[in-house]
Amino acid sequence: MKYDSNGALLATSIPGLPEPHRGKVRDIYDLGDSLLFVATDRISAFDCVMPNGIPDKGKVLTQMSLFWFELLSWMPNHLLCWDAAQFPASLKAVAGDLAGRSLIVKKARTIPLECIVRGYLIGSGWKDYRKNGRVCGIPLPAGYQQAQKLEEPLFTPSTKADSGHDENIS
């Protein structure tokens, strides 16, 4: 495991397993019939991974996911196990590092989609608006200021890129 000077987990390495697929924030290990998702403390903003992390950010992301899995428990999903104490024996040596930030999930076909709901005109939305008065192809009234609250939330899905830029879907 690789931690920064503030104790943020930046990268994982699990003895006996091949190197993971590394996304911008998560490391994904192939366990055969399932996958291990590890939410690191890496920070990704504007399609860039920052050199330092935020300690326990991965734990917060995982707890948010578990909240939604519980709220929508009536709907079938891919979650198999979230409790590191119940993970396979091959993961016991790193159970302390994985606790609270890891999920074992069913393998499934990935749909590379990011669902974004925008409440404020900031970031790439502001950049688009300044250029053409639209956000992801959605026209907005003139006169908005940077970081201003939008009258109604905007749903602006994009493709999900492992590296490089996500592309807006219009």
List the predicted regions and their residue ranges.
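A structural motif
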Residues: 158-170
